[in-house]
Amino acid sequence: METPGERYDYVIVGGGSAGCVLAHRLSARAACRVALVEAGDDTPPGAVPSEILDSYPMPVFCGNRWIWPDLAATATRDAPPRVYEQGRVMGGGSSINVQSANRGLPRDYDGWAEEGAQGWSWEDVLPYFRKLERDLDFPGHASHGADGPVAIRRIQPPDWPPFCHAFAQGLRRQGLAALKDQNAEFGDGYFPAAFSNENDRRVSSATAYLDAATRARPNLRIFSNTRVRRIVMEGNAARGVVAVDGSGRELRLLAGETVVCAGALQSPVLLMRAGIGDATALAQLGIASAVHLPGVGRHLQDHPTLTFCHFLAPRWRMPLERRRASMLAARLSSGVQGSEPSDLYLSSATRAAWHALGNRLGLFFLWCNRPYSRGRVELLTADPDTAPRVSLNLLDDDRDAARLMAGVRLLAGIVSAMGLSDDDQDFFPAAFSPRVKALSRFGRANARLTSMLGALLDAPAPLRRALIGRFFNGGRRMSGLLGDESALAAFVRRNVFGVWHASGTCRMGNAKDPYAVTDIEGRVHGTQALRVVDASLMPRLPSANTNIPTIMIAEKIADAMGRSAASRTPTAQPVYVDNQGDDDVH
């Protein structure tokens, strides 16, 4: 049964990293009616699930409750599809990710401006990075904010466990400099990783922006467990959305402006189902074209990534009751001819999983910054219940494969210099496979199984090697990969995966660019009253995790939308004021 249409000034589709920001900022104007529609559970103050609040994210990430379970992606053209974890919960990815608060490098945003997104250079975006954050370590620094909604902190060297000190030693012995602040000191080096966390608790976009005061605003309505089925179009104009709530009731939400914040995989899908995309491809699915924009769903990017583990003797392990496991990261240069400096990122974790087995394994994540390869999101059918085809096409550009191979060699040298073990077989490649993910799901059965497997890892080396070969690396040895170029190339292509930084599928740019989807304020080219505001807009994936850059994008566009609304209503309007950095940035 469909309810009569409810009218709002803005309907925001998706309560993720960007949507929560927009709900908070746009509803600050009391005369502005705002609806926020999220497909997953709400996480209101005082009722945030403990798994989401936890500083250690893997139990929530490896479960199915707060992700889109039917959303899958192929990593390369030859790879089978596998689940691609994207948040379906208030806060979106910021509620399930590793909490990294990485901005990237100035060149990333200067490149956006050069590619047609004028007004998005480093100088232009820095005020919004400052606006969003409350940096607990650098509150008075010119590059940092002191009163924004998102708390950001680092774990400093005096509080590092032995594994982190060993990692720092390995990086230092390979010639890398020690940096204090990855978000203000640029170039190669290692540093305490910044993350969105306070008092050892996650700070998601929902926690930061949808606080009790914001939720109490009478002009803001939040719909959770409500999935948008389609954008309502009249010609080229968006008039709102049709959604279905958890009880199966159909809702029609009318909007002066519809703002799509569903993420880089879901936002292009909503546009295409509304007839906005490649007209020929849509016609083949029986979808009438509203606006021909062939760039919708194209230009998909993610960081090509590999994982490695190292068996840890007892003196290198961290107590399980200490939750935060990732504390130290580094930027490196591959040295591949024609590549940019700082084109690799390396992070570590003192445990590979929440259980006794994972506590015996140190983890390394290696990825390529600013990948050259491009993928695509495509509709398979007009049915809104059918997931799209997601092709990451990682390593399609050989330059990405060459850089990742160089990164493996660099990592091997770093690990050798760490001094963790005399047995070189204790360091091994370990793909984040469906088997590993299944073993990482939180539960009593896995706790019992991993406790037994963990005890076996402490057995003599031959038994440990057999166990590692069966469960983690298929018998591959690092020495075999490093000594055989073709074996290393095959390993990289077989095991590469995305690190859940999907972006670029509705990229912003000049209207004369046939593959640009929006203008520099997220307004969809050729349409009226329709925007996209999320990681879809990124012209090129920055040298960073995507959460903080996405929040920055939302802050910047919310500011522009607020100024536009104010110019249409010149008489004084009441504005809700709080202590979350609500002043406009000019």
Residue ranges and their predicted role:
Residues M1-H586:
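N-terminal redox-cofactor-binding region of secreted/periplasmic oxidoreductases
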